[in-house]
Regions:
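Bacterial Sec-dependent N-terminal signal peptides
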Residues: 1-22
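Acidic, metal/ion-handling microdomains and their immediate structural contexts
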Residues: 8, 70-72, 172-174
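Surface-exposed amphipathic alpha-helical segments
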Residues: 20, 28, 40-41, 83-102, ...
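Short acidic/polar N-terminal linker immediately downstream of export determinants
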Residues: 20-29, 47-49
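Signature of long, low-cysteine stretches enriched in small and polar/charged residues
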Residues: 32-58, 91-139
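A short acidic-to-branched-hydrophobic micro-motif
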Residues: 56-89, 145-148
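Solvent-exposed loop/turn segments at secondary-structure junctions
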Residues: 73-76, 130, 152-155
Length: 174
């Protein structure tokens, strides 16, 4: 019986060590940061048609894919509600890039407690393979960031998913 209890305690301790926690990662040289439950590795840098820097990363954990796209706008735009229109246009572009076939519609008006210039929106997507997505986009007129989580099949919305989607930090917040 003692051996069984010792083995049980060791296994429980091992499982606790395997539990994932949020860790903050630098988004390339953008000055922005994001919290992930898995290691996204080195952020890949590419350039958009207007020469804006585009940083991307994705990792998998708990049968979910966790990702981020961060665009450092070459020409900073407007802030406040007008910036939501630019963000919505970018999300529309991403729907095509990710083969999204249906969406719930943008939930606008999200703000960040410590950063008045930030505007955000959420949406729920389904792609051509039947994968379910939840996304949250942010902009401050200088950056556009899209945090996303998707699952093969049904995506269970959990506190963990929402914590991740709220885990973006603009350069100006540092």
């Amino acid at each position: 019986m003692k051996k069984f209890i010792i083995i049980l305690i060791i296994l429980m301790g091992y499982n606790c060590l395997q539990a994932q926690s949020l860790k903050k990662y630098d988004i390339g040289s953008s000055g922005c940061k994001a919290y992930f439950f898995c290691n996204p590795g080195e952020f890949e840098l590419s350039y958009s048609a207007d020469s804006s820097k585009v940083y991307t990363a994705e990792c998998k954990a708990d049968s979910l894919s966790w990702g981020l796209i961060c665009v450092a706008l070459k020409e900073p735009g407007s802030i406040g509600p007008e910036a939501e229109d630019v963000l919505a246009s970018y999300l529309d572009y991403l729907k095509t890039a990710f083969n999204i076939v249906s969406s719930a519609g943008y939930g606008k008006g999200h703000t960040m407690t410590n950063y008045a210039d930030a505007r955000g929106m959420i949406d729920y997507w389904k792609d051509k393979d039947g994968d379910e997505w939840k996304i949250k986009g942010w902009t401050d007129g200088k950056f556009i960031a899209v945090m996303y989580v998707y699952a093969k099949g049904k995506l269970d919305e959990t506190n963990k998913v929402n914590l991740f989607l709220d885990g973006f930090r603009f350069k100006s917040m540092q």
